[in-house]
Amino acid sequence: MRRTVLLVTVLLVFIGGCLGQMENPRPTNNPSTSHPSDSYSTLPTTKYDVLKEGQEKPVVNAINSFTFDLYKELAGNNNNVFFSPFSIETALAMAYEGARGKTAEEMKRVLHLPEDDDARWTGFRYLLLSLKSPEGSPFILRSVNALWVQRGYSLREEYLGIVKEFYLGEAKEVDFQGNPAEAAREINEWVEEQTNGRIKDIVSGLSPLTRLVITNAVYFKANWSSRFRASDTRNETFHAPNGTVIVPMMHQTGEFPYFENDDLQALELPYEGERLGMLIILPKEGKFEKVEGNLSAGSIENILKNMREEKVKVALPKFRFEASYKLRDVLMDMGMKRAFLVPDFSGISNGENLAIEDVVHKSFISVAENGTEAAAATAVTLTMNAPMQEKEPKIFKADHPFIFFIYDRETGTILFMGRMMNPKDG
């Protein structure tokens, strides 16, 4: 039996007509407008596909820095946390491409986006192309973007081109004004299809004032490189903040990247294909708040650099839960106020004043045993040799709250971040 991780995340940015104030719009160099169906029907090959070492780094650094800023906002209680900073950053970056003036300045600062257009465009295009699992890959990973536009509403041709070329996003026309229920159904069907049915009915009650919905969906499914045997799973105690609970605990002993200091243990479990891995940060007794408070892109990078292959005896709970967040207030608290209150999205359209109505993020994770391993055997012949002093394996027992990341080992991009406080809380 294999242990499979299934991760799904969806982000929706609702942009509607704004009846309030708006910044004085900055003129754009290209005032032409277009309906989504009129332009960019095929994905062009551009100079941005010429690979350069490190070209994705500015965007990776932005995503990883944003990860910890957002985590601090979401982790204000003892609940489980799970979100995709990659998904959220990507969708908001698409909105940023149409922001102007102080609205753009605030968004750039909160999202840590590169100042240089080419660096931003190159980085996102590279990541979105690079992170798509190829045919025959041992894991499934896809990130897809779409713009849902009010039928007949004109978007700037320049904006449509940027989203199509650099964010690989497709534009679809719906009728928010005349039939918002049908528009919601179409978006929900798309989300359900892109997430293999894991996330349903994410949109409801759309306003007739809605002009644009920006969506990003990320889906990931993989097996561990080193499998847990179902026969080794047993019910054990997990020490949650509000008391102990009994959970199924997985066990195995193997060679894994490992790091330890006075405050924490860190373990990496690679997935099949070795491209992606789960990094688990397990604070030592009484150190959770200290470890959590010190988390940053730099501290995680330092842990990864100092990991060494060690023999580790691993105990990890099975868990499965959904998380749903409305991020409007969170993003405003982080400093992104103008996008909601006094916006300038004149780079998206020449028409009505546009404002972000809300940002909705929904995610799902399942870490469980499934599938079958049939008729496989390995024979190893051993001969007696002089006894050697064998090091005792490190003990990594995740029977109390821990923090985890799913990240791309090639670029260092954090795709998902979570906090497991109680595996029983689904």
Swiss-Prot record:
Pfam assignment, any one: Serpin
Any single Gene Ontology cellular-component annotation: extracellular space
Chain residue ranges for the region called Disordered: 23-42
PANTHER family linked to this entry: GH10112P-RELATED, SERINE PROTEASE INHIBITOR, SERPIN
InterPro entries xref list: Serpin_CS, Serpin_dom, Serpin_fam, Serpin_sf, Serpin_sf_1, Serpin_sf_2
Family that this chain belongs to: Belongs to the serpin family.
Name recorded for this polypeptide: Uncharacterized serpin-like protein TK1782
Keywords from the named record: Protease inhibitor, Serine protease inhibitor
Example of a GO MF term: serine-type endopeptidase inhibitor activity
Organism for this UniProt entry: Thermococcus kodakarensis (strain ATCC BAA-918 / JCM 12380 / KOD1)
Disulphide-bonded residues: none
Biased composition (Polar residues): 26-42
Site (Reactive bond) residue list: 385-386
Lineage top rank: taxon: Archaea
